[in-house]
Every structure is written in C-alpha cells, then in structure tokens.
Amino acid sequence: MTEIRFDALCIGNAICDVFAHVEEDFLLQEGLVKGSMRLIETDEAVALFNKMGQTVRISGGSAGNTAAGIASLGGRPAYFGKVAEDELGDSYYHDMNGTGVYYNTPRLREWKPTARSMILITPDGERTMNTYLGACTEFSPSDVDEDVVAAAAVTYMEGYLWDPEEAKKAFLAAAEIAHKHDRKVAITLSDSFCVDRYRDEFTGLLSDGVVDLMFANEHEIKALYQTGVLDTAISAARESGAMTALTLGKEGAMIITPEETVKVPAQQVDNVVDLTGAGDLFAAGFLFGLARDYSLTNAAELGCICASSVIKHVGARPERPLKNLAAQNGFEV
C-alpha cells in the first residue's frame, strides 16, 4: 500500500483574491454598484484588472484556504486546482508552495486567464467584488494525479466542483482512486445555493458511500435536507451513513455519525472582523486532527480554534502560525 505522505489533499477552484483601494468615482466610471458581488466574463475581467492600479494579491479559494490552514498547523497538505500560465497564475503557484502546500497541477496554456476575485475597497471600507472564474473551471480528470491521491489520508473537495461537467468527473475520479487505496473522501457543501443546484446528487454521494465525511454549516445542511428545523437536518445527516462536521457559528460545532454526536463550543471572540474563512479553517483543524488520530472531540476543538483565529482579521488565510496557537491550547502538533 502507498505510504501516507499528506494529511489531506484539498481540491477546488483556484481563485486569486486581488484587493485595491479605489475612490467612489472609480466605481461610477466603471458602472459598478458599491457593495455588490457579481460574476464577469473574460474581456471585462482583463480590462478591470488592468485599471486597478496598486493591488494586494492573496491566493484564495475555499479548498486552497483549507490546505493553507493545514500547512500553518505544521501539517502536510496537497492541493489540486487549475490556474493559467499568466501573472496571477505565477503568484498563485508561488504563494501556495511558499506556505508549505504541495501544489503541482498542470497549468492552462491557452484562452482563459487565472480566476480572480477583484475586490475594490472604497474609503468607507465597503467592498465591491467582481469575480471571474476563468481557468479554474477547466479542472478535469487529467489533472488528478493518482500518486498524490493515494498518498493522502483524506481527499477533501469543494461542492463547487459539481458546476463544470469535467470538474464533476474529476471529483468522482479522485473519490474512486482514494477508496481504491483505502483512503477517505470528504466534501464541503460550499454554499446553500450550490446545495439547491445539486441536492439529489449530493445526498446520493452520501448514501452511495462515495463520500465518507461531509462539512456543512447550518444553512447548507438545512438546504440539503429541505427543512427549516436544525434537529430534523441533524437526524437526516445521522441516517446518511456518513460523518458530518457541522459548524454552527457562535454555537460551536457538532460532529454527527451514525453511532454518536459530539458537540464542542466555539472559542470566544470579542471582535469579529471577517467571517469569510471560518468554515475553511475549521475544516483545516478538523482534518489535521483526524490525520493524527485525535478523538472527534479534540479534532473539532482544534477546528474551532483555527476558525476563531481567522475571523479576527481580514482575509481567509492565517496571519500567524496556527501551530503556535494550537500548542498554546494544549495540542501536540
């Protein structure tokens, strides 16, 4: 059997977050509605990017954030995600590998630039987001490296991969390889709208044993089981046969299996700045804990510690090593 070399392989949309401070007039000139979030096409994405002036670039994407979190804990993550052979693709590659993530997905050589979320910040702090998916939607089964999947304790994938047909095929191919090598497969539901699009297919992944572990928040799990009652959704998750890691914001987290339910409290945070990466970093802590044979309680506690750290600042990546924070809270990392 292949030796486990990675705590987790994270697979998802490789998106570069590009931040720029702009004046109100800039939004007016570009016909943008302040505070809005929208998807844009290639020509507009390139034109807007070229007008942004001085920018700060941070590699993003949900699964990428989780991989970076595992690395920050001192773990060994790998990542699959598609970028182009362009300036932002260079930044993404450098950034991911620089944080300690093994990342070597072949780059797209033609026609679609690297995905980017261009975030324009006006003097009042309001964010106007313009997202171009570009190259990340071209992830396909040919990008799934069997040796890496076989060497990962768990393969963790975004629900967003279900949108492009080739990415869906890649998801299923990676899951099949993982199980062939007696590894685990996890999905994060991504958002409630994604759940609404693919509800039957996602529940099928659970009931058919394609997915062993599901990550969801309260909105997503209610959407999955079409109920407004959390306890009803929890009961349905318990009957799915898979493990569910459920984040509940200020109420902490719950781990649900057919045999047991574990509840852990959230860490106290007095000044919440940005909730963007909370779920991604919870997953990082939990997956890290599972790879090191922590109890479900301890793995969930570490997940909550990681989530509490990232919501204290802007952005979805750790600002300080999570390894130190975990050690301060009594974890051996």
Predicted region positions:
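Hydrophobic beta-strand scaffold residues
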Residues: 77, 103, 185-186, 244
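Glycine-rich phosphate/adenosyl-contacting loop at the front of the ribokinase-like
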Residues: 1-80, 87-91
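Conserved beta-alpha-beta core of the PfkB/ribokinase-like small-molecule kinase fold
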Residues: 154-235, 242, 251-253
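A short, aliphatic-rich alpha-helical micro-motif
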Residues: 3, 148-151, 206-208, 238
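A glycine-rich helix N-cap at a beta->alpha junction
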Residues: 95-112
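Conserved phosphate-binding/catalytic region of the ribokinase-like
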Residues: 1-9, 14, 28-34, 177-180, ...
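Alpha-helix C-terminal capping segments
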Residues: 67-76, 120-122, 289-292
